[in-house]
């Protein structure tokens, strides 16, 4: 579960290493984001020659959470940490590579590009 002020690692090759959630999108009273939800983030740590700079604000989609995601068959998939992929204003991924596994819950029309770039889909 991601909320405002949560820090996430970045699972793409945009050059950002760590981001801070500044807003969970989807309603004025919405508090938590899970896998597949869109959040507004600011870059807290970035590589020197990356595509993004520290302090930049982007949309991002949550791809992994330590809280996990419950499936209809009763199984629970958890990860060691929280991770997100940076998106542009059209909600398309900025990076060209995805690092680490992503969950099958991202297989919607909006995020098929992320699923196809990911090395492993759980």
From Swiss-Prot:
Name the Gene Ontology molecular function terms of this record. large ribosomal subunit rRNA binding; structural constituent of ribosome
Spell out the SUPFAM superfamilies in the cross-references: Ribosomal protein L14
**Domain of life per record:** Bacteria
Stored HAMAP family: Ribosomal_uL14
CDD domains per the record? Ribosomal_uL14
Cellular component annotations (GO), alphabetically ordered? cytosolic large ribosomal subunit
The GO annotation for biological process reads: translation
InterPro entries, from UniProt? Ribosomal_uL14, Ribosomal_uL14_bac-type, Ribosomal_uL14_CS, Ribosomal_uL14_sf
What is the documented function of this protein?
Answer: Binds to 23S rRNA. Forms part of two intersubunit bridges in the 70S ribosome.
Q: What is this protein called?
A: Large ribosomal subunit protein uL14
User: How does this protein assemble?
Assistant: Part of the 50S ribosomal subunit. Forms a cluster with proteins L3 and L19. In the 70S ribosome, L14 and L19 interact and together make contacts with the 16S rRNA in bridges B5 and B8.
What's one Pfam family the UniProt record gives for this protein?
Answer: Ribosomal_L14
Q: Gene encoding this chain?
A: rplN
